[in-house]
Amino acid sequence: MQQAAEFSQKIKYFFSFERIFILIFIIALFVRFWHLDLKLLHHDEAIHAWFSYELLTRGVWVYDPSYHGPFLYYVTAGMFSLFGDSDLIARLLPALFGTLLIPLVYCIYRLGYINKNQTLLAALLLALSPEMVYFSRFLRHDIFMVFFTFLLLVAILYYFEYGQTRHAIIAAIATGGALCCKEEMPVILLIFALFFIYAVYRGKFTLPHDWKYDLILGSFIVLTIMSVLYSAFGAHIDTLVGQNFALNTTGWYKAIEHWIAMHNQQRLGGPLYFYIPFYVLYEVPIFILAIIGTLQLLGKEFNPSLFIRRLKNRIQYFRSGVPTDELAAISLQQLKNQDTVHSKSDVFFGFCVYWMILVMIFYAFVGEKVPWLIIPQLLPMCFVAVYKLNWQKMVFAIVGCLFLAVMTWHVAFIPADINEPIVQVQNSEDLREVMRLIDASDHVVVASKNYWPLPWYYRGERWNKIKFYGDIVDEPTLTQDNPGVIILYDAASYPSIEGYDKKTFKLGYWFSYYDNENRLIDYYFHRDGRMGSINIDVFTPQIAS
């Protein structure tokens, strides 16, 4: 009996809350960093890496809203300076920032907003979420913005809890960092501001005595960070004040103008429910638990039985003339019986539901719809999913994590072209063979309007052996220097070139709904089928027999 008790104590010690949380952190670390350069850079990643390389080698960066804010470029250029320029180094910081979401969950726990089980499950969902993992291994601005958003939330909650200026400073740094990532961050700030202003008004939070001083200090920090980075450390002041102080030439005016145009144009448009299939494809357990959590919380906020009893009391008052004070006493007793007093946890989860719903509505409305915009929606969803966590939901979540793990493995760790919407337009693994041919040649001709990511992979002096034409040219021009490789866009190519063998490769590929719309259920379980692609024709000299 004593041995059994000792064994039980050892098991409890080994599987303590802290040890399990550290294990989850290690899992998050592993799935984000392992084989980080397994796949070629995505089209957008290659552009971001190229701009960062240009910033490092030529000191050139000017704000262009098409390519978002400066934070990514400066930190990536810094990594290239320290460790060299490569696919692996380009993805290190996104992986790090994606991993650091996990410790921030622990910060929420330390403040008492979530219990131990909720902490472990929320951390596990963030650690294994296929889309969180995929876009943490991806050189885009979104994972940086998500991290800063979460850091801002933690800093705000700590500020309300302890009232210390240092937490206001952290909140300001997080805000400045997020605003230097992407142009939709002001909308997220507005969502946060409306809730917390209302919460303070209702007495859910109390502002410290020196909050006005902290607000001024924080605003100064935010403006300083943005001014320094957006002006390229003063090299492009016109981004801030405009050319000759013309309002319509400022960076923020151009950003608003550009993204309103993109919204109206719907260049990458989609229906309002665009992101729902992504939840069904990759995040089913999180999505289902979040729906249940939302219904539970909203059901608590609006209790039908309590409403009916109050209505009966009101009718009784008009019919029988019950004194007002007696009616108030009856309603008060019913209110107490229903336990409608909001706990600290309820305020937090109420915020998460509000945050999740509004951010989902915002991204559903925005005309530009792309897979990576799902991760700002997933962040609050992972917390809503752990609301009122009982053993049934816990079992469902643990089993569901097996699904998340399998999908994470499928989308992130299979070194092949995968027929998945998450990839958007991914550079094909076929390019590895194309680049082997380029590496083996002393002279290469590229006559195609579709050629990325070649400028990234042949940056610097490596580009010297490549003669580039923006579009197809005549055969004599292509062959005048006897190139070892000729690359043409297959839709604007030649059936053959004398003296050369021709082979077609995929340049980039994407999931094609139209090629799979009649077999969606079959596709869901097999994840196969026909893909859309952009192709290139590669001509190499014929080998004499």
Per-region residue spans from a language model:
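Transmembrane signal-anchor helices characteristic of membrane glycosylation enzymes that use polyprenol
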Residues: F17-H42, F220-H236
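Membrane-proximal lumenal/periplasmic loop motifs of glycosylation machinery
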Residues: H35-H43, L56-A77, S81-R91, W259-Q266, ...
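Short acidic/glycine- and proline-prone juxtamembrane loop motifs at membrane-interface regions
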Residues: H42-H43, P94, E131, R137-F144, ...
